[in-house]
Amino acid sequence: MRFLILFLTLSLGGIDAAPPVQSRILGGFKCEKNSQPWQVAVYYLDEYLCGGVLLDRNWVLTAAHCYEDKYNIWLGKNKLFQDEPSAQHRLVSKSFPHPDFNMSLLQSVPTGADLSNDLMLLRLSKPADITDVVKPIDLPTTEPKLGSTCLASGWGSINQLIYQNPNDLQCVSIKLHPNEVCVKAHILKVTDVMLCAGEMNGGKDTCKGDSGGPLICDGVLQGITSWGSTPCGEPNAPAIYTKLIKFTSWIKDTMAKNP
């Protein structure tokens, strides 16, 4: 099974592909029940893989580095390890990684690698039922403002050093920073199709297990979790999110061409 550890130690020269240990919420809090009805849990077979976002009844958005050959999708979940009557299970009929994402990086990530275009659309095999606990979220129409307070959510590890998924969906509030902050912090390229968000004092972050999940700034979906540093939550090292305003045309075109 292929999965990429995208959260890299700052001094690391490169990293090989490894079993799924994705990005997580660190220093956050239990999300209010059903407060994130667009949140998706993406599984590879029966193993939790990544987060995702419901865009409409037929489409889920996640990170391209979450690519696998089979998926199980859960909608409307609050608890990762418990059955919930309101949750919905779906399969994926086809996946659409962004064509400009460098898929060779699923094997290894050398120093200076460019992880731009880290997004993927998943076409559900059966439309989601829209309910009080399963709702899509709109794509952004304007650029996010620097300094905005953003909310990230996911079931990634709540332990900084040991991979430990929580049962309850976690939320964390973080700030949006100029990309120059992340350029100084990371050994990989930071480009204009990325967002830089986190707490400069450390302690609050996404990390292993949150990849593909939403970043909502001032109430608007602006990003999905992409990559960052290990250990997560270090001072002066915000994480990287795919900047969705740069990709709305591709997302809409892909959805329209694959009804």
UniProtKB/Swiss-Prot annotation:
Entry similarity comment: Belongs to the peptidase S1 family. Kallikrein subfamily.
Organism from which the protein derives: Mus musculus (Mouse)
Location of the active site: H65, D118, S211
Protein name: Kallikrein 1-related peptidase b22
Annotated gene: Klk1b22
InterPro entries in UniProt: Peptidase_S1_PA, Peptidase_S1_PA_chymotrypsin, Peptidase_S1A, Trypsin_dom, TRYPSIN_HIS, TRYPSIN_SER
Cited function: Glandular kallikreins cleave Met-Lys and Arg-Ser bonds in kininogen to release Lys-bradykinin.
Signal peptide extent: 1-17
SMART domains (UniProt xref): Tryp_SPc
Pfam families, A to Z: Trypsin (PF00089)
UniProt-listed PROSITE patterns: TRYPSIN_DOM (PS50240), TRYPSIN_HIS (PS00134), TRYPSIN_SER (PS00135)
Residues listed as glycosylation sites in the UniProt record: N102
Lineage: Eukaryota, Metazoa, Chordata, Craniata, Vertebrata
